[in-house]
Structures are given as C-alpha cells and as structure tokens.
C-alpha cells in the first residue's frame, strides 16, 4: 500500500522517517478550488506520517494576486507555502525558494509532468515549485449537431472552418465561439499561440527580439484572424468577446465549437450555467495547424517562501502534496472525509494516462494528454504583461479588419523598445 503507517521505518513519497519536524505548523495559501479543498480534507494523512500540522487559507482567484504579492512585500514568513498563477512567477522569483537541491536529494524527477507544466514552475533555469493545478486546452464541440450533419471531430483548423461553415448555414448559430477581445488579460493570445508555434514561429528569438514577424509567424496570425474576417465562422461579438463571453455563448447553444481550458467541461452541462445536456457536449485534443499541434498551457504552482522559518518541514509537505498517488486519487474519489468533491484536474502524465482516472472523468485526461504532447507557456519574463498587452491589442484591431502584418510589425517595434529599455540588448 502507498500509505504507510508512521510506525514503519520507510515512509512513502520520500518523506523523512522519525518525524523530525513534529509539532511544526505550516501556513498554506491556496486558491479556492475543489481540488485543493480535497487536499486539505486529506491532510490528516500527512500529519499522521510527519507530525506536521497544516493551516490552510483558501483565497478566491480574483483576490489571489494581491494576497500573494503582499506575502512577498511583508517578508515575514507568515505563509510558508504559496500558490500562484505561473505568469506571476517571474515577479515573485526573488522570494521563492528554488527546490532543485531537494529534488536531487530525494530523487524526484520533474519529467513526471508534461513539458509545459514543468516549465511553468521554473524561472531562469531554476525550479521554484510544483505545478499542482494546471490546464491544457481542448476543442469542445456539439456532438448532436456534428452527428446530425455527419461531421467528424475536427482534427485540424481546416476541419474547424468547414464544420463551422456547415453549422452556421444549416443551424443559424455561430460555428466557433471566438474571443478576439482585449481586456488586459491577454486571452486572445491563447489560440493565436497554437497557430504561431505550430507554424514553427515563436514569440521571441534567442536574442529576445520579437519573432512573430517572420513570414511564417505573420501567415499564422493571418490564418488565425481569417477564422473571423475571411471564413466568417465565429459567433456573435467575436471582436469584443473575451474567454468568458465565448464560454457563455457555447453553453447557451449559440455556437457549436469552442477551444478552451479543460476545466470548462463540467460547466458546459451544469443546468445552472448551461442549456446543454451532457450528451450534447464532446471534446477532442486541439486541432493541428500546418500538420502540427502545439498548444498553450497554464499552471498554478505551489512554492516555498524564502522567508519561511520552516523550510525543511515545508518541503516535506510539498513532497506529500505533489505525490502521484494523491494526484490520481483526487480525480477518482468523489467524496473526501464526508464532503462531496468533483475534480478532474491532474498534472502528472501518469495520471492523465491512468485508466481509472479516465473512467471517472469521461476520458477527458486522455484528450488532454494528446493536447499536451507538444505544449508551451507564455514567456516567463517580468516585462511580459507589457509586451503581451501590445500583442493583444494588435490582434483585437486585426480582427476588426485592420492590416494584420502592419499591426504585428508595429507591436514588434514597440516591444523591442520595452525590452531594450529593460536591458535585454
């Protein structure tokens, strides 16, 4: 059994035997989600193995950035372990404890995670934590409408275009729920990156110069914009919609496809949020572009604060929290300590390929694993919000009929100025 009793000499998950940190209380700051509530409900297991007590603070996502930032500013060790969005990591890196030496000592291999998840918990070559909540992209589609019109699940973006045109003309609803809107969250880059990377282009080159203006990069961008401006397959409001608007559009039956995070699945057949029933909602891995699929992924790592006075005890907690068996059980068991929990989020590759995990979750992890085979993250630099906003604005303007190439070249010039000022060249 993977759960050894504390009387055994050898504990699971590379935990130290003999309870060297018994009596320590760790303060954990985490985002509000059933996945992490379930971890808290299981923490007696950790306490029985180590004698370490856990004190959890769960903060809603909208308030999380401010809360985590204040932990870094206070610098008083009030929280031993913090949970944050990967793109905030670079600005926190100076007060997060690198874990590479511990990983090596305890024989833990970060290759247990998909590449994008692994990268999301790193900064400048150092590992700062474990990606314990992470989201791949999937293409959700209306199974009933695809069946009705003899359409197959889209394997590439040409399939998306032809299915979108068929459904728009026959059903009078949007083929694809598009989100080209720009509101400061840079969500209109999420699908653009799939096109850019699959074309062999990138955001920056090895010199950190903007690389999206190569001929391949510009063609990929035009093809992404063309979904709306040329092919006309998008639902209403495409040029101003952000991701949430697109999710609502799909859930209300006003568009037949949406490329979005896997966590959206349960909401698409939740009667409080959606007009659709479960048998109308299907999903597939992200479509290929130019014969290749490269997807964007996002994660929420856990890291130890450099200001913690209990770093070794905190590392014991991190080992327990990130162990593959817990990851797996947490997506299978629907009740934890008497509380109903529904969670499909796993981050270990082994969990995504696990038969029981897939059986409990309509095989969504299997589709996610396909999306994640080739995957990447947004650039991990402190200047990314500024550069990303320039790109998001250019893409929004392009979707309204602006000159794609010119807009992207202008964004590149402005971005280069920002990065020059920051000392990259």
List the predicted regions and their residue ranges.
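Short, solvent-exposed loop/beta-turn-alpha elements that line the ligand-binding surface or hinge
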Residues: 16-23, 100-115, 180-183, 199-219, ...
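Extracytoplasmic "Venus flytrap"/periplasmic binding protein-like
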Residues: 42-115, 122, 144-155, 248-249, ...
């Amino acid at each position: 059994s993977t759960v050894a009793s504390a009387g055994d000499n050898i504990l699971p998950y590379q935990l130290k035997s003999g309870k060297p940190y018994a009596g320590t209380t760790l303060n954990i700051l985490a985002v509000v989600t059933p996945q992490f509530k379930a971890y808290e409900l299981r923490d007696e297991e950790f306490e029985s193995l180590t004698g370490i007590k856990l004190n959890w603070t769960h903060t809603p996502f909208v308030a999380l950035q401010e809360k985590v930032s204040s932990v870094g500013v206070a610098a008083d060790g009030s929280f031993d372990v913090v949970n944050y969005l990967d793109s905030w990591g670079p600005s926190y890196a100076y007060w997060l404890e690198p874990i590479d030496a511990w990983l090596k000592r305890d024989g833990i291999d970060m290759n247990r995670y998909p590449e994008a998840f692994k990268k999301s918990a790193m900064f400048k070559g150092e590992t700062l934590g474990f990606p314990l909540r992470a989201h791949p992209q999937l293409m959700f589609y209306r199974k009933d409408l695809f069946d009705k019109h003899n359409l197959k699940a889209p394997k590439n973006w040409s399939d998306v275009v032809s299915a979108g045109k068929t459904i728009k003309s026959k059903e009078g609803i949007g083929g694809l729920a598009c989100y080209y809107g720009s509101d400061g969250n840079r969500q209109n880059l999420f699908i653009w990156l799939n096109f850019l990377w699959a074309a062999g282009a990138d955001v920056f080159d090895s010199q950190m110069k903007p690389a999206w203006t190569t001929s391949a990069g510009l063609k990929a961008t035009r093809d992404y914009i063309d979904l709306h401006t040329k092919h006309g397959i998008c639902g209403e409001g495409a040029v101003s919609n952000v991701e949430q608007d697109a999710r609502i559009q799909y859930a209300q039956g006003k568009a037949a496809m949406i490329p979005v995070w896997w966590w959206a699945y349960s909401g698409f057949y939740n009667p409080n949020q959606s007009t659709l029933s479960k048998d109308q909602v299907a999903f597939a891995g992200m479509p290929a572009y130019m014969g290749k699929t490269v997807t964007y992924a996002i994660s929420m790592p856990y890291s130890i604060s450099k200001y913690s006075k209990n770093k070794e005890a905190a590392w014991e907690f991190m080992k327990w929290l990130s162990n593959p068996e817990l990851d797996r059980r947490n997506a299978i068991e629907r009740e934890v300590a008497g509380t109903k929990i529904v969670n499909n989020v796993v981050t270990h590759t082994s969990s995504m390929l696990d038969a029981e995990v897939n059986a409990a979750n309509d095989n969504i992890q299997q589709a996610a694993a396909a999306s994640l085979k080739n995957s990447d993250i947004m650039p991990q630099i402190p200047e990314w919000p500024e550069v990303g906003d320039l790109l998001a604005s250019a893409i929004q303007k392009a979707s309204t009929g602006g000159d794609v190439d010119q807009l992207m070249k202008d964004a590149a010039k402005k971005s280069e100025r920002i990065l020059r000022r920051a000392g990259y060249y």
